Curated annotation (Swiss-Prot):
Keywords for this protein: Disulfide bond, Secreted, Toxin
Single annotated GO MF: toxin activity
Cellular component, GO annotation: extracellular region
Principal location class: secreted
Disulfide-linked positions: C3-C9, C4-C17
Tissues expressed in: Expressed by the venom duct.
Origin species: Conus pictus
Protein's UniProt name: Conotoxin pc1A
Location within or outside the cell: Secreted
Domain notes: The cysteine framework is I (CC-C-C). Alpha4/7 pattern.
Length: 18
């Protein structure tokens, strides 16, 4: 998901990135 491409987003929502 596009969140995973954004470092701060991936840190806030770690479960979204495989």
């Amino acid at each position: 998901d596009e969140c995973c491409a954004i470092p701060f987003c991936a840190k806030i929502f770690p479960g979204r990135c495989p």
